């Protein structure tokens, strides 16, 4: 199977290009020294996240590894999908929580893990579970962890630039160019917000792509639509607790793990609107397998 993100890939790269332009613009305003420190900081921090993304996410969810005897249905489905995609079998984990969700993590297919909660395993039938696991495997095969880390690094650069420039202005300003202190204050306030908005837009774009790629892998977009409906209502009944370490991993989940009332708007959402995702999957089913 060939993994091709279609229009969502173009959208992702466009957003990353906007990120790059924002970094250059902000860096030019504050000078090379501050920009160098910000880039160095961001690269170091996100390199750590990239190489340890699986450990961080699995630890936050208190996930435990499982084998074929412990989770026969989940193991069978993942093995079949990995074989279909001609990709390595990921490590499998289960998180003992009633909150219905699933996520994939790992820097590449050979170093990947897929985790389901006990809540989602109890809620979905086998067809729906297969669709969810296809979605999660697509995140791995489309290298979404790498893309997420690149977007995160760029956001960190902009935030670090804004913070460093703000403190530099407090202790003598920008000696290289005499930048207006009001401009520094404005960028210090708006830069991190803009970076967060773009990073979350990248995350939402990757969710749309995983829905599409997962439906192509399983050949059953309606099963994923059905699963998303159940997960959405299930999260309202049994959300994850709003703890900082869980909030940091929310973008990895197949659905926002917190109640809808706790969202603060589409621009700051980690996931696209559930109704929109379901509508797209139903449209895929209407086109037929040969025209996805």
Swiss-Prot record:
UniProt-annotated catalytic positions: 136
Main enzyme class: hydrolase
Cofactor binding, note field: Binds 1 zinc ion per subunit.
Gene Ontology cellular component terms for the protein in this record: plasma membrane
Binding sites annotated in the UniProt record for Zn(2+): 135, 139, 207
Entry EC number(s): 3.4.24.-
Topology in the lipid bilayer: Multi-pass membrane protein
UniProt KW keywords: Cell membrane, Hydrolase, Membrane, Metal-binding, Metalloprotease, Protease, Transmembrane, Transmembrane helix, Zinc
Gene3D superfamilies named in the record: Metalloproteases ('zincins'), catalytic domain (3.30.2010.10)
Alphabetical list of InterPro entries matching this protein: HtpX_protease, Pept_M48_protease_HtpX, Peptidase_M48
Transmembrane residue ranges: 10-30, 33-53, 145-165, 182-202
Subcellular location: Cell membrane
Listed cofactors: Zn(2+)
Keyword Zinc-finger: no
One Gene Ontology MF term: zinc ion binding
GO biological process terms on file: proteolysis
Any Pfam family hit: Peptidase_M48
Keyword Zinc carried by entry: yes
Similarity comment: family membership: Belongs to the peptidase M48B family.
Entry protein name: Protease HtpX homolog
Gene name of the record: htpX
